[in-house]
Amino acid sequence: MAQVQAQSLPTITPESPPRLEVRRISKRFGGLQALKDVNLTHEGGILGLIGPNGAGKTTLFNIISGFLKPTEGVVIFDGQTIHKRRPHQIVELGIARTFQIVKPFGDMTVRENTISGLGMPIYPRWQALVQRYRTPDTLHASDAIMALTDLTAWAETRADSLPIGLQRRLEIARALATGPRLLLLDEPAAGLTASEAEELAQLIRTLNAQGISIIVIEHNMTFAMGLCHRIVVLAQGEIIAQGSPDQVRHDERVINAYLGQEDADA
């Protein structure tokens, strides 16, 4: 196993954030066109990816993180083509991801879940090896990550006994343990109260201030508009609008495609 460094988070100067390029990405599932000619660049800051259900947001995340291969197009991260790589290889390059459905290792403590993230690039089935690698280095690194994510008080608590707000923090802690330069967050505010969502938003801002680029999929428009520096809107697999939160909020295409659906569902 590669030696785990006590300093687990990357040191990135504001002048050199990682660059993600999505070039002409399309994805078809049989006759269904999930993504069509999507072009996207993200370099630093917090980017929000919003859109109605079925717009292709999670499909795009799955392609960036290696869980799906595109039908057409390429994904480039800091000059390296990554769209043909496996998920653990993409983690090794510095891209980590959380999922909308929270899946901590329920029979393990918060600390053990965090340590599992430290081994993710090398051992995809790390949970079976956690006890073996409870070393001073991993314990020190997990302490730092739990302090950053405000989970120290629950270090020895089983993950499956945590409320949803703390489980979402734990998902981020596990992702941080891999030392990401780019963090993909899929619906991080889902199921949270307004106060819990604001606390989580503050954590995300802190991570970004430390040099981690972040892309957030979010259905909560208030959360996304208050958090993100730039918003990209997907509808029917295509980007229909992008810009600052204020620009997107007043874009008729967004109102018709996204807010209109919310009104119809109300």
Q: In which residue ranges do the predicted regions lie?
A:
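Glycine-rich phosphate-binding loops of nucleotide-dependent enzymes
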Residues: 2-266
